[in-house]
């Protein structure tokens, strides 16, 4: 049984405190009503590491896939503590790979992007399980294809990764590729709670992989995702939040003006609608 959504420090406290969730689950475990105890999370890597380091859990469900490898160190720590690692929604949150862009299809050849991403995840020996939400029957066949190719993953994956990396450098420029995410303010410390790191990531995905549909969905969820997808999108830019305010918190960044221009572009593209989490639809 997994404690669902340890996304904040308060959530973790409620889970591990005396008389909290873990104590209750241990009693159920002793009564042979449940087996292993884990947790799922959309939280920051530092929070997930803190939860793993309590040594109170048997497994963790988290997000990690090719386009978002932020939790790589978390997965390595989970191995140190002998935790099972379950990857949440690698097809959908991994870039809407059920409806991939033509560019993504081309860059992942000879594999379908779903197959590539599955193999990318499972070639990491510290990853044990993927969830495979299926939009259509053909998607399931692609996941089975990935399983059939597990023993051959090294034949395909390094070449595709190199191709994707080179395209990223070609499109974004080497300087931006290497430095775009350095010295960015966290959303909590940004005027309007604008989540600049996530927004720049989405902008990069559009420019690099033509992931406009995925970027639109994530952009429109910001501001409506609570602790599951925290912070706000760029809709407040030039309304309640001025360029000058953002320049102040971006002082250490390699190109603050470029950041703001990218935020404006996202607002122009996607600022007309609000999305809801899947569980709220």
State each model region's role.
Residues 73-281:
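Structured C-terminal cap/extension of enzyme domains
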Residues 1-73, 79-87, 91, 109:
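Glycine/proline-rich, positively charged
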């Amino acid at each position: 049984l997994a404690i669902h959504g340890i996304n904040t420090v308060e959530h973790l406290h409620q889970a591990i405190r005396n008389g909290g969730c873990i104590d209750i689950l241990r009693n159920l475990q002793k009564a042979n009503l449940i087996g292993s105890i884990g947790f799922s999370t959309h939280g920051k890597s530092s929070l997930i590491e803190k939860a793993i380091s309590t040594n109170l859990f048997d497994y963790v469900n988290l997000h990690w896939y090719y386009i978002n490898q932020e939790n790589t160190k978390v997965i390595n720590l989970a191995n140190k503590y002998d935790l099972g690692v379950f990857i949440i929604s690698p097809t959908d949150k991994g870039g809407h790979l059920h409806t991939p862009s033509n560019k993504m299809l081309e860059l992942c050849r000879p594999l379908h992007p779903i197959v590539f991403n599955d193999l990318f995840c499972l070639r990491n020996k510290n990853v044990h399980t993927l969830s495979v939400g299926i939009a259509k029957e053909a998607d399931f066949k692609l996941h089975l294809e990935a399983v059939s190719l597990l023993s051959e993953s090294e034949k395909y994956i390094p070449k595709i990764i190199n191709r994707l990396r080179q395209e990223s450098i070609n499109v974004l420029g080497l300087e931006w590729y290497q430095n775009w995410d350095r010295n960015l303010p966290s959303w909590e410390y940004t005027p309007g709670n604008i989540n600049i790191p996530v927004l720049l990531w989405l902008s990069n995905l559009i420019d690099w992989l033509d992931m406009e549909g995925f970027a639109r969905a994530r952009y429109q969820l910001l501001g409506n995702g609570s602790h599951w997808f925290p912070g706000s999108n760029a809709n407040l830019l030039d309304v309640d939040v001025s360029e000058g305010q953002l320049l102040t918190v971006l002082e250490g960044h390699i190109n603050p003006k470029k950041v703001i221009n990218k935020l404006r572009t996202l607002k122009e593209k996607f600022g007309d609608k609000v999305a809801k989490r899947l569980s709220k639809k």
